[in-house]
Amino acid sequence: MDSKLRSLLSDHSRYVESFRLFLQNSTEHQCMQHFIESKLPNIISSIGNDKPVIDVLGVGSGSGEIDLQMIAKIQARWPGVPINNQIVEPSAEQIFGYKERVAKAPNLENVTFSWHRQTSSEFESQVNEDKQMRKFDFIHMIQMLYYVKDVLGTLKFFKSCLAPSGKLLIILVSGNSGWATLWKKYGQRLPLNDLCLYITAGDIAEMLSSMGARFQSHELQSDMDITECFIEGDRDGELLLDFLTETCDFKRNAPADLRDQIICDLKSPGCSTTKDGKVIFNNNLSVIVVEAD
């Protein structure tokens, strides 16, 4: 890694700004919403059988937009059954946004919310210290496994937190996405450190197979307009480049050869397509659903 390059996560406000821009320019949340509408009801169809309370755990839930859509599907499947929704999220800013969202949302009378301002590893340590293994009927980890130090250990721990008939839902970038192309080629030169791992759903599937876990995978088609990345001096384009490389102020700080190579490769068929004069990045995702033992 070039010594001048810093992880985007080291500048929280710039990370949040670039992440919001990513959501604005991509179909990330739309493709997740389509999955929740079309596939999630079947996935959760038996998690609450004979349960007086349904226990849900969100790990790295952000501001809760996707969480509340999934909660609505659980409510639709088991009307009136109390839902205990625990949230593990390290960002105070995101928790504040989540609480604001809950305050405005209708039809949450039977849902209790508990927020834990922790990383997933801090939550794991606390559970192990308390020696009281909580069991959950539904656990979801959406776009967060990049930020844990021990991915295999994290998978084993949260799988062990599943109640009988429980499901663990993981969403990550697909192994056939532009992200995978970018990370395989440039991961060694980008700020790969304690803050971020360059992993895809393909890596997770291999780990789950090595554990002997039962799981299914679903591919979600998603794209992102990155045209602004190629406009000189465009601030939004620079923020999107930061997000794509997980690097703070990439355009200014990256060595010229690395910057030029990545900008060139972002236009290549392995990363993007060109349509109506726009450069559209392959943001495909994979959903992995892990079964309880």
UniProtKB/Swiss-Prot annotation:
Give the GO terms filed under biological process for this record: histamine catabolic process; methylation
* The UniProt record lists the keyword Iron-sulfur: no
Catalysed reaction equations from the record:
histamine + S-adenosyl-L-methionine = N(tau)-methylhistamine + S-adenosyl-L-homocysteine + H(+)
PROSITE patterns with a match to the protein in the record = SAM_HNMT
Alphabetized CDD domains for the sequence: AdoMet_MTases
Q: Which Gene3D superfamilies match?
A: Vaccinia Virus protein VP39 (3.40.50.150)
Subcellular location(s): the record lists: Cytoplasm
GO terms for molecular function, please? Answer: histamine N-methyltransferase activity
GO cellular component terms, semicolon-separated? cytoplasm
EC category? transferase
What EC number(s) are associated with this protein in UniProt?
Answer: 2.1.1.8
User: What does the similarity note say?
Assistant: Belongs to the class I-like SAM-binding methyltransferase superfamily. HNMT family.
The job of this chain, per UniProt, is described as: Inactivates histamine by N-methylation. Plays an important role in degrading histamine and in regulating the airway response to histamine.
Q: What is this protein called?
A: Histamine N-methyltransferase A
The gene designation is hnmt-a
